[in-house]
Amino acid sequence: MTVENTALTLKKRFRGYFPVVVDVETAGFNAQTDALLEICAVTLSMDENGDLHPASTIHFHVEPFEGANLEKEALEFNGIRDPFSPLRGAVTEQEALKEIYKLIRREQKAADCSRAIMVAHNAAFDLSFVNAANERCKLKRVPFHPFATFDTATLSGLAYGQTVLAKACKTAGMEFDNREAHSALYDTEKTAELFCGIVNKWKALGGWPLIEDENEK
């Protein structure tokens, strides 16, 4: 494999990290006390030309953990009227996370990456809820880096001058249906599309692969 082809791999592009796009819907802003109600993850793959694309999607509605706080305003915002309704088909936090991590580990290994890194819109929020759920479930083998992320709010602010997901997507030339927004599944798919678009645009503009000094090869 040539130096250039080596650079056009997921492993090389993100310094050994395997990016996974995540979105959560919750019953408030406090990751320690408020319920995690929905989670979706989209893995990414890189084609032979070095362009990034969404790969696999995994999505769960989640049962509120025992004693979880449910803020009325948050439920109205995300449209989850009754978190305890059997019609949601919800699973426990542990079931959801274990299945998500199983998929991530499999695809991370196939990409020869050393660790997963979360990609999310306002990533600190999503990571805080995932980390809190990991602690509640006493999960030891967590694929995500505990604090490093790729935040598409920041990246889209740089690339498109917009930090709101809907506005960033529209500025990027993507379709965005506000009626579908605040569903973890829809928001994750759109965030994945946005992140891939930013990475691919940077490559198309000549930002990647880096031009290495001959003495460093």
From Swiss-Prot:
Transmembrane segments: none annotated. GO terms for cellular component: cytosol. The active site is at H182 (proton donor/acceptor). Binds two Mg(2+) per subunit. The active form of the enzyme binds two Mg(2+) ions in its active site. The first Mg(2+) forms only one salt bridge with the protein. GO terms for biological process: DNA replication proofreading; tRNA processing. Mg(2+) 1 binds at D23. Its EC number is 3.1.13.-. Mg(2+) 2 binds at D23, E25, H182, D187. Gene3D superfamilies: Ribonuclease H-like superfamily/Ribonuclease H. The record marks F29, F77, F125, F147 as: Important for substrate binding and specificity. It comes from the Bacteria. Keywords: Exonuclease, Hydrolase, Magnesium, Metal-binding, Nuclease, tRNA processing. Residues 20-195 form the Exonuclease domain. Its cofactor is Mg(2+). SUPFAM superfamilies: Ribonuclease H-like. GO terms for molecular function: 3'-5' exonuclease activity; magnesium ion binding; nucleic acid binding; RNA exonuclease activity, producing 5'-phosphomonoesters. InterPro entries: Exonuclease_RNaseT/DNA_pol3, RNase_T, RNaseH-like_sf, RNaseH_sf. Trims short 3' overhangs of a variety of RNA species, leaving a one or two nucleotide 3' overhang. Responsible for the end-turnover of tRNA: specifically removes the terminal AMP residue from uncharged tRNA (tRNA-C-C-A). Also appears to be involved in tRNA biosynthesis. Belongs to the RNase T family. Homodimer. This is Ribonuclease T. The lineage of its organism: Bacteria, Pseudomonadati, Pseudomonadota, Gammaproteobacteria, Vibrionales.
